[in-house]
Amino acid sequence: MQQFIFYKKENYLAFTKTRTSETKLGEKIQAISNEKKWQDELKKSSAKFVLIGIPEDIGINANLGVGGAYTAWKSFLNSFFNIQHNQFLKGDSILLLSLLL
């Protein structure tokens, strides 16, 4: 699908700062392994939550604000992937699907 940029596990592990005594969400989050069969993988996934990045700042610009929010996706990933995986927020219950263009 041309509108999606799919993330592979090795792509987003670059956002994760690992430590020996901690497990981060970025180490546990599920990924799509076959871009051509992403819909089948999504159906079979055990994830409760699916992340899709949508870079836009239309609302901000429409309200005469300062644009630039479309760049926030990478900052979000950098922060989100480094949250600790724990009993309340389990990384394996999340699937990072893609960035929507």
How does the language model describe each region?
Residues 2-101:
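Metal-dependent C-N hydrolase catalytic cores
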